Amino acid sequence: MNTIPSLALQPKGRAPTASTNALIMKTVARFVYIITFVLLPLAGRAAPHLSDHIRPFVGTQGEGNTYPGPSAPFGMIQLSPDTDRDLWETASGYEYSDTSIMGFTLTHLTGTGIPDLGDFLFMPQIGEPKLLPGTKENPDAGYRARYSHEQESASAGYYKVKLLNNNVTVELAAGERAGMMRFTFPQSDSASILTDLQHFLSGKRFKLIWSHLRVEDNSTLTGFHLVNGWAKERYLYFAARYSKPFDHYRIMSSGNEVKYDSFRTYRFRSRNEAAGTNLQFLAEYKTRPDEVIMVKVAVSAISAANALQNLDSEIPKADWNFEKIVAATREKWDRELARIEIDGSDWDKETFYTGMYHAFLAPNLYEDVTGEYRGMDSNIHHAKGFKNYAVFSLWDTFRATHPLFALIQSQRDSDMIQSLLAHYDQSADHLLPMWSLQGNETWCMIGYHAVPVIADGYLKGVKGFDADRAFQAMKTTAMNPDYDGAAAYAKLGWVPCDLENESASKTLEYAFDDYCIAQMAKALGKKADYDYFMKRAGSYQNVFDPSTGQVRGKDSHGNWRTPFDPHAYGEGAQADFTEATATQYSFYNPQDVPAMIALMGGKEKFVQQLDALFNYKEPVKAQAAEDIQGRIGEYWHGNEPSHHIIYLYCYAGQPWKAAQRLHEVIKTQYGNKPNSLSGNDDCGQMSAWYIFTALGFYPVCPASDYYVLGSPAIKKAVVHLSNGKIFTMVAENLSDQNIYVQSVKLNGRNWTTPFLPYAELKNGGSLVFTMGPQPDKEWGTNCAVPR
């Protein structure tokens, strides 16, 4: 080690020699150099943040349907630009390919295939205010503004864009329930900020029922609207505080200023308050060059008073520190991302941590600082002992998103499970949610997939909820005779295609959910329930046609649907499958893959059918499935029914084929660019698939006691489990060429089976893959499923 000589070591009374002086000067010069050019720059440079790797634009172009604006983890408010309101391509409000922005709204869904939210549009203007948005083809006709991606940026907790029409810079920041918009105006005698209550993401078919605006003082606005959208009855309030008092303000109703006019009305009409179905507000100013006006905003499903309370509790009245909000949210993201620390390239880190970011955007906190929330019954409830969440895309997220939460987000998973149970308590039909959205059941998709979320959580050690009460909710939901062919399913063992659409898919997904109920019953010592639901869990065989080797629609008399095309995609009354084909759904029996393999003629024939799926040559793109991309033959990674299929190779003793396909999907359908998602992210499911797959294992069968080993895509990961244990994955020799598993060691022991027991994972330890460029066809052939 180099040391700096000390003058104190010179002999007493002896002057330093010339050579000693030279050495001292040289050493001092080196010391000054180190301080000036090494230590000081490091002192001024922040340590790397995991949130620096987040790329919010991923998924905003094409089918991903994500939004670029800021949100706290699982936050209640999501400030983001909207470029359209009427198309499924802008279900999140924003499409990267659009060239103009309608405005900036306070709430957004992430990755869904149906639009909703996009509440309360704010838009700065210069000149005579415009009250209509105009069109994408002619944005100058309205308050839309052109923009360029060269003058747009986004990072964790922050968004910025320059509006080219009016030279206004817009910046957005968001906390959990409140956020801030910062507008930098040019000099103008006619600057304004429009608030449009009629705006929401409508898909051309939804309706604003009622709205209300109130000017609380010369810098505070509150409002409300009731929307009949995807969520049938959605109440939302907002509060906004402006950093600069209004020079002038106007409430507009159907394009006219709300004010007293003795010739038009015989009653006094306040200019400070209005109700109707087409309300807008204009805050008008004279601005100096580069003058900044900020607007603090918050939302509530309860009342305007609660929205103000949410706002003032998160951003106090006197606090206009925009950077403080950005920094606080960025810090929250750093804490969440630190649950998994990885080693890899910049591409690896940006792809992985953006995936975690998307997986942790939803479900959304749905309660005020008071603990109040609007429930399924439209009444006001108080969340006692838990935080209430909403936006449960369960048909998607039961597969990988919630299993991820069970491992590394157990407290939130517990709160989410309690939110599902609260929904059940408030449901007129005594059902757990199917697809819940801000206190509403949308009845979207199929199955009763709150069941695997609860069962997997409980069996993975998630605590804090009443397991017996949860089991009763699961059982009651499954036995409800009025739900989607459930009565016929209970009687016949399948959902008949002459009585119910998407019947084959419903049969298969009900059977899986019943398996999950059985596992919960087993854990609780309820043997009769276990036996009953395990019998129902075997319903796959009831819709498997041996003559075709495929799952097929069957009517109430036991006759197969004719004609039958295993590759046909359909929706509606004549469709037996949900957003998929018979070939794809024929591989869905995750609760008993060995039985499925046996029905298909054994492992060799099963692998042949898997190969045929990937090698299928599609003559024409399937109709009505334009948003389902990521196609490799008839494997469609852009939609959830395919997500587990690659891992089925492992059950048949050929995990090297899984490795090839997994890396193909990762390299072609994920990344760090706006178009890097091949399908709707669906509240994080597409992203959660990547997270698990990159780690080298995947929950093919949630609520089981094992994961399936695949082929890792990152060199090292340290997973901080919710129970405090640390699980480390290492992929030795991993490269773009070395994608095949040669051997595995689990906690130092040779591991020859392609299954990872949860009992091993939960205690922490290490999983070490050795990778190579060619398949090792000996490893993983021991494919007996853990029992």
Functional labels for PLM-detected ranges:
Residues L7-A8, H53:
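Ser/Thr/Pro/Gly-rich low-complexity, intrinsically disordered segments
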Residues L9-A18:
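Short, low-complexity intrinsically disordered segments enriched in A/P/G/S/L with frequent Arg
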Residues K26-I34:
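Sec-dependent signal peptide recognition
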Residues T36-R45:
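Hydrophobic h-region of N-terminal signal peptides that target proteins for export
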Residues A47-H402, A406-P452, D456-L508, C516-N542, ...:
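Accessory carbohydrate-recognition regions in carbohydrate-active enzymes
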